């Protein structure tokens, strides 16, 4: 299946180079399109030409690219247009070994397959405590009953620790059961002035320490903590104290947008509004997948099918921009006139 996807990507990118009718094509583009179009026309009985000039010819070439995108992604889109019918035989065209694929396309598909079939450490973009169900007012003393050290969440990436005079304790537990981190990068600071429960102000005295694995850590410096070593706080002074611990970032096995080069840009290209026809076509295609059909996914996709679909659909979007096809989509009423931000914004409502 990797070679099928690589051929589809190669052919679509070759079609995206046809920005002028009289353009001098590169030799490899002529070879790719010559073989691919010949095989495609023979199996589907379409009349795609290598140098489309009329609207009908541009439509035919775009429909060929659409067929290849759907076949490579394994999508059966169904009846979406009175002008287009998906040709299932296109998979046979892409399976033809005579159609070459570029090194770039093959490498990209190999990266998609390789990265989605395994896991690796990645810097996560969200706060470590993002999904906490409760938070506490920053800089306000809070001590639970029968405790001398109390740690609470006060933000998506922040905890604060209240300590009685002379208290020592381990605050590791507040990090447990969250995000399965491989490494957490922390910075701790003294809260110089804080409010007691009665509202009066109190100062944290110098001498309060935070240690990892028994080694005191300097305040205001990034600490690499594996989440397993003891994370101790100690207040040797004779007054109550508070410290703040910030998670600068953390590393885990969760997939991010860095798993594939330019994945963020590919997603933006897919979900961008070009016109109402493209908007309806993209929606109809993504309705047959697990991806959202109008707005980008909340979390990075982590399976091969989703990332491959985004890559292929982004390339099809480039072909759409170049060929400027005109055809109808069921349920879509194109609006005449120039494209404006207001028109694009209204399409997502």
Curated annotation (Swiss-Prot):
InterPro entries tied to this protein: Capsid_hemagglutn, Orbi_VP7_capsid, Orbi_VP7_capsid_C, Orbi_VP7_capsid_N, Virus_capsid_a-hlx_vir
Predominant location: virion
Residue positions with a glycan: 287
Biological process (GO), any one: fusion of virus membrane with host plasma membrane
Keyword Glycoprotein carried by entry: yes
Any Gene Ontology CC annotation: viral envelope
Protein name according to UniProt: Core protein VP7
């Amino acid at each position: 299946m990797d070679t099928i996807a690589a051929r589809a990507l190669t052919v679509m990118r070759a079609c995206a180079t046809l920005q002028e009718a009289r353009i001098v094509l590169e030799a490899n583009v002529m070879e790719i399109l010559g073989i691919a179009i010949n095989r495609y026309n023979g199996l589907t009985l379409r009349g795609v030409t290598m140098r489309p000039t009329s609207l009908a010819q541009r439509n035919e070439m775009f429909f060929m690219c659409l067929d290849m995108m759907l076949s490579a992604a394994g999508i059966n889109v169904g009846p979406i247009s009175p002008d287009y019918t998906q040709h299932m035989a296109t998979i046979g065209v892409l399976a033809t070994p005579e159609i070459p694929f570029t090194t770039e396309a093959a490498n990209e598909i190999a990266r998609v397959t390789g990265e989605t079939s395994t896991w690796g450490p990645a810097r996560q973009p969200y706060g470590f405590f993002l999904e906490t169900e409760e938070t506490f007012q920053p800089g306000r003393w809070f001590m639970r009953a029968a405790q001398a050290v109390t740690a609470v969440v006060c933000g998506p990436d922040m905890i604060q620790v209240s300590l009685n005079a002379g208290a020592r304790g381990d605050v590791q537990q507040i990090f447990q059961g969250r995000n399965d981190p491989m490494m957490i990068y922390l910075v701790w600071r003294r809260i110089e002035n804080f409010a007691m429960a009665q509202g009066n102000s109190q100062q944290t005295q110098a001498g309060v320490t935070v240690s990892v694995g028994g080694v005191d850590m300097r305040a205001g410096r990034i600490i690499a903590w594996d989440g397993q070593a003891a994370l101790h706080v100690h207040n040797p002074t004779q007054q109550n104290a508070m410290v703040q611990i910030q998670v600068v970032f953390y590393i885990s096995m969760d997939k991010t947008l860095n798993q594939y080069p330019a994945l963020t840009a590919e997603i933006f290209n897919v979900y961008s509004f070009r016109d109402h026809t493209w908007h309806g076509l993209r929606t109809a295609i993504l309705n047959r997948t697990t991806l959202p059909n109008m707005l980008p996914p909340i979390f990075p996709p982590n399976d091969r099918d989703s990332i491959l679909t985004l890559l292929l659909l982004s390339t099809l979007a480039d072909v759409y921009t170049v060929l400027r096809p005109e055809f109808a989509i069921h349920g879509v009423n194109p609006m005449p006139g120039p494209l404006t931000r207001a028109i694009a914004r209204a399409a997502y409502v």
